[in-house]
Amino acid sequence: MQVSVETTQGLERRLTISVPAEQIEKLVKDNVLREAKRARLPGFRPGKVPIGEINKRYGKAIRQDITGEVMQRNFIEAIVAEKLNPAGAPVFTPGSTEGDSFEFVATFEIYPEVVLTGLDSIAVEQPKAEVNDADVDVMIETLRKQHATFAPVERAAVADDKVKMNFIGSIDGEEFEGGKADDFELQLGSNRMIPGFETGIVGHKTGDEFEIEVTFPEDYHAENLKGKAAKFVITLTEVQAANLPEVNDEFASLFGIAEGGLDALKAEIRKNMTRELEQALKANVKEQVITGLLAANDIAIPKALVEGEVNVLRQQAMQRFGGQTENMPELPAELFTEQAERRVKIGLLLGEVIKTNELKAEDDRVNTLIESMASAYEDPSEVVSYYNSNKELMQNMRNVALEEQAVEALLKSSKVTVKDVAFEEFMNKATGRA
């Protein structure tokens, strides 16, 4: 076998491989003979079909199969010999089989050689927060509102009231589609409506008819309404006030607390809030480290890996439609390309961090991750057992652990400053509520 390697562009390589033609001819001949022995054709006894008839019927297909096998086998031998690491399947271009040799070309991309740089330039502001009694009280107040009952009142509407109304919206005196409703129910302060709508209702009583003027946000989903000033004529048909449950042991029982009453509920709330906080803190630091790593290391990436990641993201997006995708057109790759490129770069860079630091997934860390995740379920032990019995899920969790370890390794060389933050402020930002 003779091999020549050519760099075409970027990470693309072209291998020209030449092998003795007799290698193919012998295999073709052997396969034709094998087919002749087992072929059953009309007019011929089993195993007595002439070679010429086999060649006529199956010769072309047999040669194509053998040629493909020879190219694949010799390609593998060639990349091992040349120490090349393909990032995707090769494209084979077979040449002529005339003469003493068979030559073919294999075109493919290789993985980039990643050399980590600028790790000491990564700047991380590490937030430090904890759950205190006031934070637990805020959560309890939220739970009270979620379990509130409502009753009609004869007074002006205030925040947190529920109201029923009829309304008609118009722009420049013309009604618009979706701007009219009857018996519409709304809780004031829920921010379901565009800015100014809910606050415009506060202070009005049942039976009031009034107008409010609002402006649709520039990022409103309906293109024809973006940035438009609108007028709504509203008739308030009912105002309902919230009756919040008392915070006591009976309230605790609403959340499945069988023993310990209110104190047990508060302890459970604190535990859940602490778990969510720790996850959010970890995610915040990880994102800063990853962003800094990408900024310091602009690497070339194989198109094949990006295309594969695009397909994964596209499939995930389609699944979010709940399986109702039969008649949907395929989502364009452009929607996912930027995210796919970022994910491929992160994977390659973190892979090099793991390799450089000789990291192995720590069993204790894997178990802690599983237990932490399982604690959010009603029966944590059942979830832990399910993970431990599923090889694929366990491998996924080991990958998560390795990624954590890689981020921690990068933190050691990063410029880290610690900043105290309040729980509510941090979590609002982390969840996009700020």
UniProtKB/Swiss-Prot annotation:
Among Gene3D superfamilies, the record links this protein to: 3.10.50.40, Trigger factor ribosome-binding domain, Trigger factor, C-terminal domain
Q: What is its EC number?
A: 5.2.1.8
Q: Which domain of life is it from?
A: Bacteria
Cross-referenced InterPro entries? PPIase_dom_sf (IPR046357), PPIase_FKBP_dom (IPR001179), Trig_fac (IPR005215), Trigger_fac_C (IPR008880), Trigger_fac_C_sf (IPR037041), Trigger_fac_ribosome-bd_bac (IPR008881), Trigger_fac_ribosome-bd_sf (IPR036611), Trigger_fact/SurA_dom_sf (IPR027304)
Domain PPIase FKBP-type residues, every copy: 160-245
**What catalytic activity does the UniProt entry give for this protein?**
[protein]-peptidylproline (omega=180) = [protein]-peptidylproline (omega=0)
Q: Which Pfam families match?
A: FKBP_C (PF00254), Trigger_C (PF05698), Trigger_N (PF05697)
Q: Which PROSITE patterns match?
A: FKBP_PPIASE
Say which enzyme class the record assigns: isomerase
Sorted alphabetically, which SUPFAM superfamilies does this protein's record hold? FKBP-like, Triger factor/SurA peptide-binding domain-like, Trigger factor ribosome-binding domain
Its subcellular locations are: Cytoplasm
What GO MF annotations does this protein's record show? peptidyl-prolyl cis-trans isomerase activity; protein folding chaperone; ribosome binding
**Task of the protein:** Involved in protein export. Acts as a chaperone by maintaining the newly synthesized protein in an open conformation. Functions as a peptidyl-prolyl cis-trans isomerase.
What does the domain comment read? Consists of 3 domains; the N-terminus binds the ribosome, the middle domain has PPIase activity, while the C-terminus has intrinsic chaperone activity on its own.
The UniProt similarity line reads: Belongs to the FKBP-type PPIase family. Tig subfamily.
Q: What is this protein called?
A: Trigger factor
Name the source organism: Shewanella frigidimarina (strain NCIMB 400)
What's the encoding gene here? tig
